[in-house]
Amino acid sequence: MRVGIYYRHSFHQAIVQSTSRALQPQHDCLATSDTGELTRYRPHVIVAAEDLTYLHLRAHLPLSRFVHTRHGLANKGIPARSFRAADYVCVTSEAVRDDFLAQGIRPRRGYWITGYVQMDNLFSAPRPPQIPAGKKVVLYAPTWHDGLSSLPLLGSRVVDLLHAGRSDTFVVIKPHPLVQQGKDPKLAPWMQTLRAAARDRSDTYLIENRGEDVMPWLNAADVLVSDASSVQLEYLALDRPLVLIDNPEHVTSPHYDPNGMEWKWRDMGQRIGTADALPGAVSAALSNPRLGAERRAVYRERLFGNLLDGRSGERLARRVDQLAPEVASDAQLLAVSPIGHAVHTSLPYLRNASRAFKRLLRSA
């Protein structure tokens, strides 16, 4: 079969790398971020981390089977839309599948219990060379959504707060790739603040590479500081302490999802609501790595079960193998390809028209 592996952003490549390796021996694979190239390829199956609704991929390829790996484990209100657009959705455990079913969230054809493919290298990832020996590593990995991110709370004091007044710490700051990109005028000042705070600090490393795989940094961290990011759920696998910062405006954010594990399981770490509480929480976590371990163990089992063996990509590939009897024929894919080409050609114009109409409404 032809299998298209779609990544919208460069940082999605790390999510699908183990899946790509597992698929290539058995299938003709194309990994691309170009929807036009994907459409011309006419894949029988598409594996994508991205929410398919953003890009109208089904309109491009109406007969292809869509497999959604997710690009993070936090909900943020996305599964109700993105899961229903996919034929199959990969989840990390039976318990997680059952939670979504209880909420009435169903893919078109079913869930695949594979584990989370991005985490396949979590336990094997080497320690990044930027981290000096003998230091306790504090990893700060905030989300990017306005109202959820802790970046505005910490501001220019971010580095000093994370060091918690200790001399034995090395702080690593891993902004979300969309913050790193800096094109959004709402997000650009956050990156500028981080650069200024980390400048000339030998005890602090700011990750600037948008495509950087976060797994080696998670594996190296002694404590994770976050807010409502997916990394806090991935970090549960390592059984190390977390500090979670609540933005006071989180309940007003359109991405606040009280049904998401990022909020239902808030006691997975120390929960704080002010910047001034951060140093004490970080120091407590570093002094007692077993802090909160009992709750973390409960959530880790529910989230991952026994699927932390680094073989999630292989399990996904085996499920793709089994799709052969149900995929469209080459003749069928060829017959509908003019539809895909027409959609790909016209979509930019439709988007521009939609934006112009919205601007007109706002100015009226």
Language model region names:
Residues 187-210:
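Nucleotide-activated donor-binding/catalytic signature segment of Leloir-type glycosyltransferases, i.e.
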Residues 62-68, 211-254:
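A donor-sugar binding/catalytic signature common to diverse glycosyltransferases
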Residues 4-124:
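Active-site and donor-binding regions of nucleotide-sugar-utilizing enzymes
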Residues 108, 230-304:
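Catalytic binding pocket for nucleotide-activated donors in carbohydrate/polymer assembly enzymes
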Residues 4-7, 12-23, 119-193, 272, ...:
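Conserved catalytic-core segment of nucleotide-activated headgroup transferases in glycan assembly
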Residues 1, 23-31, 166-171, 202-204:
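A generic structural motif
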Residues 47, 67-68, 88-90, 112, ...:
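Hydrophobic/aromatic beta-strand patches that form the interior of the parallel beta-sheet core
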Residues 275-364:
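C-terminal amphipathic helix plus adjacent low-complexity
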